[in-house]
Amino acid sequence: VRDAAYKYVTDFDVALDIGANVGFWARPLTEKFKQVIAYEPMPQVLECLELNVKDLPVTINKYALGKTESTVDMIYDSVNTGNSHVDEDTFGSGNVTVKKLDDLDVPKFGLIKIDCERHELPILEGAIQTILKHKPIVIVEQHADTEYCAGEFLKSYGAKELTNVRRDYIFGW
């Protein structure tokens, strides 16, 4: 998926990795980008993420992103940490901070990867102004069994689906 996306990227200064987990994306992104900004709220994987990107140009933000600023609980999957996810029923009452990307001072970025186990649409809703400002290549995971479609949301703002690799869709402008 990365290689498919790289063909469309024109700005290799900064990449955003939303749902960084243990660094499966953040680490290889540093081979192409000067700086990677990672977002990962799961305390159970943060130490591994920090070790995997040690001495690399990666900034780790230890909070979740979403549609509104709030708090939420996370459901941890110890068998496959990549399946850990936001507990949608706990917005406003959880112990993990949620911020909107649109409220943050992020530098111009050429690529944004969002893989947050069915929480992609709320993240996009809270990031759309920043995305429209920078018009990066967007990689977003989409599940066929979800009620929403992150891709349709992006298309409603003028994004074009460039290609997909299994459940990962690549959009551009």
Task: Locate the predicted segments by residue.
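Phosphate/nucleotide-binding beta-alpha loop and adjacent structural elements of enzyme active sites
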Residues: 1-173
